[in-house]
Every structure is written in structure tokens, then in C-alpha cells.
Amino acid sequence: MFLTLIAAIISFMVSAFTMPYFIKFYQLKKIGGQQMHEDVKQHLAKAGTPTMGGTVFLLVATAVSLLVNLFSIKNTQSLALISGILSIVVIYGIIGFLDDFLKIFKQINEGLTAKQKLALQLAGGLMFYFLHVSPSGISSINVFGYQLSLGIFYLFFVLFWVVGFSNAVNLTDGIDGLASISVVISLVTYGVIAYVQGQFDVLLLIGTMIGALLGFFCFNHKPAKVFMGDVGSLALGAMLAAISIALRQEWTLLIIGIVYVLETSSVMLQVSYFKYTKKKYGEGRRIFRMTPFHHHLELGGLSGKGKKWSEWQVDAFLWGVGSLASLLVLAILYVF
């Protein structure tokens, strides 16, 4: 536990120290910044804000974790577990980096196409499964203490889990500080689970990422001086999925990650309902003012028809939802 605290503090300090230099380099080179959605007018002033800040906190967390684990890992099983989680973080970070690079440096608005991104994500998921999950012999999901055997279909579950949550966190990263602190809340919860299970190597990895993310948040809270970009959000979502698998608590991510589930569900519902009503009535109708859900809250509160919410209000509400959901999971696991 002490080692985890030291690693978290080091990650925080290095991340917070290096981020201003990243931002300054970005501005001096006059690199194109984040593009804003025109439908949310209060965001237009953020156009040009440096992005790809996830590159910094991912490098910091990975480097500190590897350095500390070199002196703390005592068996090959722990080494395989940590290397598996780190590998999926790095792979998805590279995918996000490519996407950001094409948008910013090559001025390709779409970045990677949806098919290209999905293909790379699936390839990364397959590497994670065959190199780190399959050798462990895991082929079942732990649901409330019961083992649901999936056999070969566990492969498809892993792909769905990793790809799904990487994209879900990516959708959540839409306003200042929302994704970074939401992920911190999720990681703290998994840190508690790892501690109770005695998975101290996983706990150390979680601690380094929490520290690096908090260092990043010093510059990502409203008004944000930097955004994490796809390089950060895709990697963080994949990391959460991998940790839930490593701790054999896959189901918990549906509740711990309720914010990401809500954001993704809002997009899916909106698109499906719009297509259905357009086919039935000749014009598309919407359930939400705008998706993902955080934009709906910005434009009119919970009902979508009330007063506009500030970004801080949206953040506080969704962080609160995530915190309560995480406490519920811990209560289910260790109290009831």
C-alpha cells in the first residue's frame, strides 16, 4: 500500500510538472487544436485548445509503473498480469494517437475512419486475448460469485468489453474534466477491490494511473488548458475493461462505469429513435436535446427543457452518479 502511494505521488508530480511544457510546445509550434461541435455554442471558444494530453499521462503512468514494478513483482504470474493490462493500454493509446495525429497534423477531420478504428481496436483486443487472457485459462465470467462459463465465446466477450468501453470513455470525454475524474473514480473503486483481493501489483498500476490523471486534471478542469484526446480516452476505457477482467469482476464495470454506459446508450437510443421515426413519420425525432448525454444536460438540464447547466454542474452531477454507483458495487461485494 505504501509503495502504491509513493508511485501515485511520483506520477502526479511528473504529470503535473511536464504538462505545462507539453502545452507550451503545442502552442509554440502552432499545432491545430481541438475542434468544437457548433451545436454547443458555449464550447466554440475552446477551439484550438491543445489536445493529445493523454500522451503525457499515459507515458508517465506506464514508465512509473514499469520502474516500480521492476523492484516489487515477485512472480511470473504477477508479471504476466501487469504486462497484459499495460499492453492493452499502450495498444489503444497508439490507436488513439494515430486518430488524433490524422485529425491535427494531417488535417483529416474524421481521423481514422470508423472501419479503420474498429479494425485496429479488434486487432488490439485479439492480441490482448491470445497473449494474456487465453494463456491464463479463463473462459468464464464471475457474476455475483457464480461462474458463467462461455468457453470459446469468452473471446468475443473480451473483444466486446474492451472495444465497447474504450469507445464509451471516448464519448464521455466531451467537457472539461468529465472523463478524467470519472475514470479516477472508477480506478479508485477497482483499487479497493484489488486491495481486498490482495492483488497489490494491480493496485500499484491503478495508483500510478490515478496519480498521472490527477496531474493532468490540474490543467483539464474548466477552463481546460489541454484535452486528453483519443490517445487518452481510448486507452483509459481499455484499461478499465482489462482491470475488470484481471480482477474477475467483469460485471462490476457496468455499474462502476455507469457514466460511460449512460453516455453510450444515449447515442445509440438517439440514433435508433431518429431512424425509426424518420421511417414511420417521414421526419426524424429525438429523445435527447443532443448526445452524448452530457450535452443534453448542458442544453437543458435533466429534462432537456430547463435552464442550461454549466459544465461544472454537469461534471458534479455525473461524478456524483459515478461515485454512488461505485459505492453500490462495493456494498454489494463486501457488505450485503
Swiss-Prot record:
It is found in: Cell membrane. One of its GO terms (cellular component) is plasma membrane. It comes from Streptococcus pyogenes serotype M5 (strain Manfredo). Its cofactor is Mg(2+). Its EC number is 2.7.8.13. Disulfide bonds: none annotated. This is Phospho-N-acetylmuramoyl-pentapeptide-transferase. Keywords: Cell cycle, Cell division, Cell membrane, Cell shape, Cell wall biogenesis/degradation, Magnesium, Membrane, Metal-binding, Peptidoglycan synthesis, Transferase, Transmembrane, Transmembrane helix.
